């Protein structure tokens, strides 16, 4: 397993995490190919981190899998924009750290799948309701109580 860490990228971590979730568990070669056609700014940085992690381990891109791709928040650059009446509003420019781990792909032997049999359907039984108690109307009940 090899790692690559790119620090202080001028990119919002929430936007980069959307792309990082897409490539987790993918083959590294396939992940880099799919990131190449994504229009997002973070796709370029994540593809760079994946290729760096593959090179750090001395692997070929087609024989490794992206085990994890994590995007953490880094320091936030704070800038000010002048506003009306001498005030100013704060502008936040977030940065992020990208950590990519790649590992050798495990080749799984084809195992014979056993299909679980369905349980037999339950027999339908008809239930009869107990007869409801007869209720007397309220006018009749109050008339009987008074007399």
From Swiss-Prot:
GO BP annotations, alphabetical order: translation
UniProt-listed CDD domains: Ribosomal_L22 (cd00336)
Gene Ontology molecular function, alphabetical: rRNA binding; structural constituent of ribosome
GO CC field: cytosolic large ribosomal subunit
Keyword line: Ribonucleoprotein, Ribosomal protein, RNA-binding, rRNA-binding
Annotated segments matching region Disordered: 110-147
Superkingdom in the source lineage: Bacteria
Compositionally biased spans, kind Low complexity: 117-140
Annotated function: This protein binds specifically to 23S rRNA; its binding is stimulated by other ribosomal proteins, e.g. L4, L17, and L20. It is important during the early stages of 50S assembly. It makes multiple contacts with different domains of the 23S rRNA in the assembled 50S subunit and ribosome. The globular domain of the protein is located near the polypeptide exit tunnel on the outside of the subunit, while an extended beta-hairpin is found that lines the wall of the exit tunnel in the center of the 70S ribosome.
Family as reported in the entry's similarity comment: Belongs to the universal ribosomal protein uL22 family.
Oligomeric form and interacting partners: Part of the 50S ribosomal subunit.
Protein name: Large ribosomal subunit protein uL22
Record gene name: rplV
